[in-house]
Amino acid sequence: MRIDVKVGRGPSGRGVVQVYGAFEGDARPERLVPRAAANDRALGRLVAGAGFRGAPNETVLVPKNGAWYLVVGLGKAKDLSLERARQLAGTAAKAARARGFRRVNLPVFHERPLGAAGGVAQALIEGALLGLYRYDTLRRLPKHERGKRLETITLVVEQRREITQATAAARKAQILAEAVSLARDLINGPSNVVTPTHLANQARALAKQLRLRCTVIPFARLKRLGFGGIVGVAQGSAHPAQFIVLEYTPPHAKQTFVFCGKGITFDSGGISLKPAEKMEQMKYDMSGAATVLGTLKVAATLKLPVRVIGIIAATENMPSGTAQKPGDVLKTLSGKTVEVINTDAEGRLVLSDCLHYAKRYKPDCVVDLATLTGACVVALGSEAIGLFSKDERLVARLNQ
């Protein structure tokens, strides 16, 4: 994807669509943004005439003087935020691709709640790139999707002095979006492809690309070293467990952050077998591990001034003649013993070994990322995640 930054107006011509935003009104949009759109009365009449009101992510495509304009709803003006700008860009990018456009112009609009141009530019590029994400690796595109590919996104700033800021912000957004896409590809991959060994190989490739230190401890050595939590979960699978450590250590780093990721590449529940309905979704149980890999990619690419350690316990949780059973007692890496009552509570077992291993780095902060319990979905639905911490300052920073 090519990303350009222009002043005043973006490119025009065949295959180009200009995107504007609109604040929601009662019967018609309250106001178009940016200022150039708000001052275009003819465009305003065309948009209102199409029955468009400006509700969040509502779209309308109108032609005017040989050009195409895609207007996306921002909702009420009082609710404007960078997240709304991000959603606008994602909605616009998907709509533009679906309609066969090759290039899209996104305005870096000036509205008081949004702050400086750099923050707006980053939100727009993040939204556009993440909105365009599709997992196409294992599917044949249907005819109506073939050949439809957005090639260029142009950020249009109002003042020349904003070019440098917007360009740097767009680059950062691109790095973040690439890391998220890496994680999404791993999460979406089927479990017969994304095995524990596959995750280990991904970590090795990332380490080679970004000059990270990578350590992979195989199953046989985990048994000898006393990783009882991971070994107990892994012993029922034909795919050997992998304990993965990635280290990003910049010069003069004074702080150390550790991220532990649950990497259950398929969770059948083990002997305490899950219901058949939606069991295919249990390939997602390695989402924490995928997120850790994406986090290390971002840290190293952006050259963050802190040490970042990623720790991943990658295994399957399967029923077999060698699987752990309810009533078994395991000795974890910390030396504590655990009685297994339900083998489908495997997440806390593998994470206990990860977290104890993390202590050797004497971290300033530890974050574990895991699809640990369906109770979170019951309580919070798909709109929020569960976050637990004793450190209120850390919670506030993570919520940003």
Ranges and model annotations:
Residues 57, 183, 200-400:
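A generic structural signal for tightly packed, nonpolar segments enriched in small/aliphatic residues
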Residues 1-263:
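Short amphipathic alpha-helical segment within the helicase RecA-like ATPase core
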